[in-house]
Regions:
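N-terminal Sec-pathway targeting helices
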Residues: 2-21
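Boundary/entry segment of secreted carbohydrate-active catalytic domains
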Residues: 32-91
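Hydrophobic faces of well-ordered beta-strands that scaffold small-molecule active sites
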Residues: 50-60, 93-95, 139-143, 206-210, ...
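Acidic-and-aromatic substrate-binding clefts and catalytic sites of carbohydrate-active enzymes
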Residues: 55-78, 98-123, 148-151, 215-218, ...
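Short, acidic/polar
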Residues: 62-86, 187-197, 296-311, 386-393
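Aromatic-rich peripheral "rim/lid" segments of glycoside hydrolase catalytic domains that contact
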Residues: 66-73, 224-247, 252, 339-343, ...
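Glycoside hydrolase catalytic-domain groove-lining segments
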Residues: 81, 142, 258, 269-287, ...
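Substrate-binding cleft and catalytic face of glycoside hydrolase catalytic domains
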Residues: 87-256, 263-279, 283-286, 362-364, ...
């Protein structure tokens, strides 16, 4: 009996090892096999979105004494900087929105330092929407449904205690105690409230993005968080973010993604109701959600968006983050990017919007010291940065990509990723900013 048990364990281990080896070989092989044979870009009527915009950090920079220049012109306000981006061909502004409502005196959340504590608040978002209305440029809201921040590495549940009418819908329960149906009641009401407040500033919203790098969760139903929707999520270790997309994406589909789809759909429904109540035409309003690609294979990315559709979330665009210099599944980041776009086009029937993109013009350090991968043909120089930016746009325009947002172009703490180099809080444009994005 003991021998049989040992044999079964050995067989299981051998089988598991074989499966892992096959997956690894498949990934390694796929890195060097790139072909467009049989590929057709998805058909879309959407105009290409040159989404260069002031970032969530720009207002803080000006408050802290930062200035910029371009071709001899001095720039001392967020409005003038956005005007520069419009002159360079930008077709929309951007705003990231957390559920935290007001700016507080310290960057602290739950007793810990939080650099996102005071850059994504509702109040700050409304000010950017007012600026978009003044400049007569559409704005793309990113609705995180997280208290201060979320991305592929970190998720937070939303908090609505600063919104009495929304908080009352929780009926005295903590967010982690709510069922999926109870969560969606609140999310729908929040979507409606938020959209009404934004649209009443007079701005135009043609595209709504729900979630930020939502690979592993949204609105509290997330890997590592306690939730009554799926109690097993709370005990999942962080390293599973790097294993599940590779070895077991079906686990993500069955334990996170299918629930998130219902949450996204609730927010979407609330947003569209706001258009109806305000008498604003919603015919051309579009929705997207974006995920990080560095932890995904092209096939896993396509499975994510198909899971959303299968479970009731209708989106018009698949959003992705693309950081070529970051560690990723592929040695050649451009091959990963291109194969991901083509997989989403072919398997999901969706165009792709690159919601976050940047490339370093020099060595990265500090928190981003690991983001120094050099892509072949694109050295980490100003020229290499500019060429990468241009080539991503040019390839994308013929391959089902309907827009690119250069992320945080004016943010000094982004290291060499930005499109300005800084001297004593003064931003001087790099080569990449000299390009005319309108051409």
């Amino acid at each position: 009996m003991k021998m049989k048990k040992i044999s079964k364990v050995k067989i299981a281990l051998i089988t598991l090892t074989a499966i892992v080896a096959l997956v690894v070989v498949k990934i390694l092989t796929a890195q060097f096999l790139y072909t467009e044979r049989g590929y057709s870009p998805v058909e879309t009527q959407q105009e290409f979105r040159n989404a260069l915009s002031v970032s969530p950090f720009t207002a803080t920079a000006f408050n802290n004494g930062y200035t910029y220049e371009y071709e001899g012109k001095q720039i001392g306000s967020i409005e003038d900087l956005e005007k520069l981006y419009i002159e360079k061909g930008a077709t929309e502004m951007y705003v990231r929105i957390a559920t935290k409502r007001h700016v507080t005196s310290e960057d602290i959340t739950d007793g810990e330092i939080d650099t996102n504590a005071n850059v994504h608040t509702f109040d700050q978002a409304i000010e950017l929407c007012k600026l978009a209305a003044k400049l007569n440029i559409p704005i793309n809201p990113e609705v995180m449904c997280a208290y201060t921040y979320m991305d592929m590495e970190k998720q937070q549940a939303p908090r609505f205690d600063e919104y009495p009418e929304l908080y009352a819908l929780q009926n005295g329960k903590e967010w982690s105690e709510l069922s999926l149906e109870e969560i969606n009641v609140v999310l729908k009401a929040y979507g409606k409230f938020l959209a009404k407040e934004i649209l009443q500033t007079g701005c135009t919203v043609e595209n709504w993005n729900l979630g930020n790098e939502a690979n592993f969760g949204f609105a509290g139903v997330s890997l590592g968080l306690e939730t009554a929707v799926n109690p097993k999520l709370a005990n999942q270790p962080d390293f599973m973010r790097y294993l599940l997309p590779l070895f077991n994406p079906s686990w993500l589909e069955n334990n996170i993604w299918k629930y998130n789809a219902k949450e996204f759909a609730a927010v979407r429904e609330g947003i569209l109701e706001a258009y109806d109540e305000l008498g604003i035409d919603k015919t051309n309003v579009k929705f997207s959600t974006h995920i990080a690609t560095v932890v995904m294979t092209p096939g896993a990315s396509a499975r994510y968006f198909n899971c959303m559709k299968k479970n009731g979330y209708t989106m018009d665009t698949a959003g992705i983050s693309f950081y070529p210099s970051a560690p990723s599944m592929y040695a050649d980041s451009m091959i990963l990017f291109k194969k991901t776009v083509m997989a989403i086009n072919n398997k999901c029937g969706l165009p792709v919007f690159v919601g976050e993109f940047s490339y370093p013009s020099g060595e990265m350090s500090g928190a981003f010291a690991g983001w120094n991968k050099v892509v072949k043909g694109y050295p980490n120089t100003e020229e290499g940065q500019a060429n990468m930016f241009r080539d991503v746009i040019d390839w994308g325009k013929t391959h089902g990509v309907i827009g690119v947002r250069y992320w945080a172009a004016d943010y000094e703490d982004w290291g060499t990723m930005g499109l300005f180099r800084f001297e004593n809080k003064h931003g001087i444009p790099k080569t990449g900013l000299a390009m005319d994005l309108g051409k």
